[in-house]
UniProtKB/Swiss-Prot annotation:
Protein family membership: Belongs to the TRAFAC class translation factor GTPase superfamily. Classic translation factor GTPase family. IF-2 subfamily.
Region (G3): 390-393
Region (G2): 369-373
Annotated gene: infB
Biological source species: Leuconostoc mesenteroides subsp. mesenteroides (strain ATCC 8293 / DSM 20343 / BCRC 11652 / CCM 1803 / JCM 6124 / NCDO 523 / NBRC 100496 / NCIMB 8023 / NCTC 12954 / NRRL B-1118 / 37Y)
Gene Ontology molecular-function annotations: GTP binding; GTPase activity; translation initiation factor activity
Pfam families assigned to the protein according to its UniProt record, in alphabetical order: EF-G_D2, GTP_EFTU, IF-2, IF2_N
Protein name stated in the entry: Translation initiation factor IF-2
Chief site of localization: cytoplasm
Alphabetical list of InterPro entries matching this protein: EF-G-like_DII, IF2_II, IF2_N, P-loop_NTPase, Small_GTP-bd, T_Tr_GTP-bd_dom, TF_IF2_bacterial-like, TIF_IF2
Span of domain tr-type G: 335-504
Cited HAMAP family: IF_2_B (MF_00100_B)
Length: 834
């Protein structure tokens, strides 16, 4: 039996010293050790007594030749040598660690021990193996008490959880040392070589991190790195995915011929991919946008086990059917603001009245002080909205006034007290009566000297407008729009009349209404002023307007404020159309953009066919045939303007002009700048281009100069009408035709102080005469058109120079002839009627 070590100050058994493996010394070290054993080393010099040799653990069970025959077995015992140093492995002596260089004692060589793995804990790690057996339990209990105290402080009402008594289990550290644990066995010997490895197991106890619960072992932890586990947890759904419930198939598939897979998927409540796959299995290859015929749709329905029934084809281009009163649900009608149209003669104060109502200044910005196109405005009076339509009073705007009367609920007839009833006043009365709208007469300018409102009332009685004070039913209000006199009374009458009419609309339906004005804006494209009559319009609605279509991109009111929706009786400006509609066209919001596109394209196609069939369209062939027939004298004119209302007004006025059988033929009208196509058409037909508030593009201007196309610009319609009428009167006079008689090229210039510059030239074609007119052309551009000043050959003045001769000449009132200029000589000959 080996000797057991006593416990020193603790219940922990002393750690056994690791005995290194025996190692054979080299020959030189063996000889040196033998000399040390004999005590005859040179270092001693015989003066110092020999020190006992240090025990060599490598030499197990071998006697020391130095005279000390102690038995050096492998038992682990503490060193009690002088100096009080604890040389056992339990101490902290650095030189006693395995693998360190041990300072040799006298009589022993320096030997590097074989490296042994240390079981000491790392820095900052708790070494539970150095504590008593119950230290771990005590440490855990202390942490449990701290946790309970912290929980009680946070939740005072909740009693702390009772601590379960720790069950004492016998571990390898508390077992008494046995022979197997005390004897040196194995490679390392001592406790490290024992089967239980109690010291090693105690040093590897898992940390509790202060929670009283041990961290899981490596085999118990989830596999994968922290990053991979975090990514997996992120993509793992927290809740199981819900399976979408498939809607049942319809009992009967009502289809239209030409529907595609995408349309059928909405009717069948199935995905397009499923339908395409089913058709492919049936031997039909298609995609979701390809139209299907009747047989294919019926085969698909039969495969699904349902019946198929073709619906009657609807005329998508017929949008007028939506404006029937039968399509309006009366149970959903609500009150709406009245739409009031202001009519009257020129300068009777219509715009001034509206300007006073909405506190703006439109009159100052209008050309000539006359309203050129319809303006739609909405104002609030006594917490009630009133929509006003301002129609110009000139006779040229008859059609615009008629459109205003068709969309209006009330008509305000403005008559000047100092001017009385005028032709346009009578025209306004007729339009209002034709539309069936009530008329309220506003006798304006009562503040002017010489105003006679009673005379105006008497004049209007001849047109069935009898005042209430005379026993009639027409409301008369005497006002002064300039100073606002009695304007409030006029507004009260408007609201009173609106209550009598019981104006209602359904805001919960697709919007529909009429176009008040349309124009082409350079930055925003087609801009249309529309009046919503039924429903509510939203931004993004697919819309059909006249013969065009689009999607509402923006909506703004009269002040330029963007709106998200527009209720009934609201005038707005919209953008997003593909073309410029006609003023007075109807619009309607469709279910989707595809339907709107189909309806707009079909309406445009039908409109072109109607014009072609009527024979009124003007092409190059029909134009030349008409001119050749000489049925009547015509003046071809092309009209371009900034807005559609001005185009129609100017065209209508020009068509009414007729002087002794000569009339104006409007061959083309459009909105926007004058372009190259207009110039080409004018050059081919010999037409005059009239631009109203527009200018030509640079290319069109260059083309018109080279092709001698006459372009006239106006900003007041009066001037355009007067000029055309004067030209038509000149047309009735004898007709002269230009005839080019010669062509001359300038070769050289001669300058004289008294005469000026004389051009030396040669006649290339024809001849030039003293009485002929000349046209100076430079780089295909006419720089001057005038008469011949002088004509000489040598020093003699001549009246004529023929082809092939050189001569000198001057141009009257023009002294800027250059070498290389081409001069055309022509005369004006009267054309005799046939």
């Amino acid at each position: 039996m080996t000797e057991e070590k006593k416990f020193s100050g603790s219940n922990r058994p002393a750690r056994k010293q690791a005995v290194p493996e025996r190692k054979e010394l080299p020959a030189s070290q063996r000889r040196h050790a033998a000399k040390l054993a004999d005590g005859t080393t040179p270092a001693q010099g015989g003066s110092r007594p020999s020190r006992p040799a240090r025990p060599n653990n490598n030499n197990q069970n071998r006697p020391n030749n130095g005279g000390q025959s102690q038995n050096r077995n492998n038992q682990n015992r503490s060193n009690t040598s002088t100096g009080g140093q604890n040389r056992s492995n339990n101490g902290g002596n650095r030189n006693n660690r395995p693998g360190s260089r041990v300072a040799p004692a006298e009589g022993r060589p320096m030997i590097r021990e074989k490296k042994n793995w240390s079981t000491k804990p790392r820095e900052g790690q708790v070494d539970y193996s150095a504590k008593p057996d119950n230290s771990l339990k005590q440490y855990v209990n202390e942490n449990e008490k701290k946790r309970q105290a912290s929980a009680a402080a946070k939740h005072p009402k909740k009693p702390a959880a009772a601590t379960k008594p720790a069950v004492k289990k016998e571990t390898s550290a508390t077992k008494p040392a046995t022979a197997s644990t005390t004897t040196g066995a194995g490679k390392f010997g001592g406790a490290l070589a024992s089967g239980n490895n109690s010291a090693r197991n105690n040093s590897r106890k898992r940390n509790t991190n202060g929670t009283g619960q041990q961290t899981p072992r490596r085999n118990d932890r989830p596999r994968g790195s922290k990053k991979s586990r975090r990514i997996a947890a992120k993509h793992q759904p927290s809740t199981p995915a819900t399976v979408r419930k498939e809607q049942p198939l319809p009992a009967v598939l009502e289809y239209r011929v030409g529907m595609n897979v995408q349309d059928l998927s909405k009717l069948l409540h199935r995905d397009t991919a499923e339908i395409i796959k089913k058709l492919f299995l049936l031997g039909i290859v298609t995609n979701q946008n390809q139209s299907l015929d009747e047989d294919t749709i019926e085969i698909l329905a039969a495969d699904y086990g349902i019946e198929a029934q073709a619906k009657e084809e609807e005329d998508v281009a017929d949008i007028d059917r939506f404006f029937d009163d039968e399509n309006i649900d009366e149970s959903k009608l609500v009150s709406r603001p009245p739409v009031v149209t202001i009519m009257g003669h020129v300068d009777h104060g219509k715009t001034t009245l509206l300007d006073y109502l909405r506190n703006s200044h439109v009159t100052e910005g209008e050309a000539g002080g006359i309203t050129q196109h319809i303006g739609a405005y909405q104002t609030r009076i006594n917490d009630k909205l009133i929509t006003f339509l301002d129609t110009p009073g000139h006779a040229a705007f008859t059609e615009m006034r008629a459109r205003g009367a068709n969309v209006t609920d009330l008509t305000i007839l403005v008559v000047a007290a100092d001017d009385g009833v005028m032709p346009q006043t009578i025209e306004a009365i007729n339009h209002a009566k034709a539309a069936g709208t009530p008329i309220i007469v506003a006798v304006n300018k009562i503040d002017k000297p010489g105003a006679n409102p009673d005379d105006v009332m008497n004049q209007l009685m001849a047109y069935d407008l009898v005042p209430e004070e005379y026993g009639g039913d027409t409301i008369f209000v005497k006002i002064s729009a300039k100073f606002g006199q009695n304007v409030d009374e006029l507004l009260e009458m408007i609201l009173l009349q609106a209550e009598v009419l019981e104006l209602k609309a359904n805001p919960n339906m697709p919007a529909r209404g009429s176009v008040i004005e349309a124009r082409l804006d350079k930055g925003r494209g087609p801009v249309s002023t529309v009046l919503v009559q039924q429903g509510t319009m939203h931004v993004g609605d697919p819309i059909v307007v006249g013969n065009t279509y689009g999607r509402v991109r923006t909506m703004t009111n009269e002040r330029g404020v963007e709106l998200s929706e527009a209720l009934p009786a609201t005038p707005i400006q919209i953008t997003g159309l593909n073309g410029v509609p006609q003023a007075g066209d109807r619009f309607i919001v469709m279910a989707d953009e595809k339907t709107a596109r189909a309806a707009g394209e079909e309406r445009a196609k039908r409109a072109q066919e109607a014009v072609r069939n009527s024979g009124s369209v003007v092409t190059l062939d029909t134009l030349f045939n008409t001119m050749a027939e000489k049925a009547m004298k015509t003046v071809p004119v092309i009209v371009k303007a900034d807005v559609q209302g001005s185009v129609e007004a100017l065209s209508g006025s020009l068509k009414k002009i007729e002087v002794d059988g000569v009339r104006v033929d409007i061959i083309h009208t459009a909105v926007g700048a004058i372009n190259e196509s207009d110039v080409t058409l004018a050059e081919a037909s010999g037409a005059i281009i009239i631009g109203f508030n527009v200018r030509p593009t640079p290319l069109a201007k260059s083309q018109s100069d080279s092709e001698k196309v006459d372009i006239r610009f106006y900003n007041v319609i009066y001037n355009a009408i007067d000029d055309v009428e004067a030209a038509m009167k000149g047309q009735l006079e004898p007709v002269y035709e230009e005839k080019v008689i010669g062509k001359v090229e300038v070769k050289e210039l001669f300058k004289f102080s008294k005469v000026g510059t004389i051009a030396g030239a040669m006649v290339e074609e024809g001849k030039i005469t003293k009485d002929s007119k000349v046209r100076v052309i430079r780089d295909n551009v006419v720089v001057f058109d005038g008469e011949v000043g002088s004509l000489q050959r040598g020093k003699d003045a001549v009246n004529e120079v023929k082809m092939g001769f050189e001569f000198g000449f001057t141009v009257a009132k023009f002294n800027d002839v250059h070498a290389g200029d081409v001069v055309e000589a022509y005369v004006m000959e009267e054309v005799k009627p046939k």
